[in-house]
A protein has these predicted regions:
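Key DNA-contact positions within bacterial/archaeal DNA-binding proteins
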Residues: 41
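Charged, amphipathic alpha-helical coiled-coil/dimerization segments
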Residues: 65-85, 89, 96
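Alpha-helical residues within the helix-turn-helix
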Residues: 34, 51-52
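Beta-hairpin "wing" of winged helix-turn-helix
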Residues: 53-69
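Short, hydrophobic-biased segments on the C-terminal half of alpha helices
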Residues: 47-48
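C-terminal regulatory/oligomerization modules of transcriptional regulators
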Residues: 76-77, 96-144
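N-terminal helix-turn-helix DNA-binding core of bacterial DNA-binding proteins
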Residues: 3-38, 57, 67
Length: 144
C-alpha cells in the first residue's frame, strides 16, 4: 500500500507541529514548508486538508499560522489517513470498458475497501505523539 504524498505531508506537518509544541502558538505555513523541505503551495494545500479534517486550526494575521487542534496523543494516525486518502480504492474491471458502472461493486473492489479499512484500523491505536522523536540528534537531522 502506498500513501499519497498529501497524506505523507500531513503526517509530517502534524509531527512537526507536535514536536515544536505548536498547540499554544500558531506556526506559519511558510515556516513549516521550509522546515520540512516541502513547497509552500503543497504545505498550504495540505494544511487546508488538515483544517477541514479538524486536526489543526488556523489563525489569520501577522502572527498567524496553524496549530494542533488537539493534543498529539488525541490525533489518531488512522483518522488522519482516512481523512486524507481517497475514500475508495478501485481497480479497473478486467475485460470491460474503463468507466464500467459496476466497478465499485466488483468482488475485487469490495476486498480492496476491506483491506483499506483494516489498514486504517491497524493505525488507529497510534497517535501523532508516537511519531515525535524527542532525541536531540534526530531533531537536528529533521531540521537540517
Amino acid at each position: 500500500m502506498r500513501l499519497t504524498k498529501q497524506t505523507a505531508y500531513a503526517l509530517r506537518i502534524l509531527t512537526h507541529l507536535a514536536g515544536t509544541g505548536a498547540r499554544e502558538r500558531p506556526v506559519p505555513v511558510a515556516e513549516i514548508a521550509g522546515a520540512l523541505h516541502v513547497t509552500e503551495p503543497n504545505a498550504m494545500k495540505t494544511a487546508r486538508a488538515l483544517i477541514d479534517g479538524g486536526f489543526v486550526v488556523s489563525t489569520r494575521g501577522r502572527s498567524g499560522g496553524v496549530r494542533l487542534a488537539r493534543e498529539p496523543e488525541d490525533i489518531s494516525i488512522g483518522a488522519v489517513v482516512r481523512s486524507l486518502e481517497p475514500t475508495r480504492v478501485e481497480a479497473d474491471c478486467v475485460g470491460f470498458e474503463v468507466d464500467c458502472a459496476l466497478r465499485s461493486r466488483t468482488p475485487l473492489n469490495r476486498l480492496l475497501d476491506d483491506a483499506m479499512e483494516k489498514f486504517c484500523a491497524t493505525l488507529d491505536p497510534y497517535s501523532i505523539a508516537d511519531l515525535v522523536d524527542r532525541r536531540p540528534e534526530v531533531r537536528a537531522v529533521e531540521s537540517a
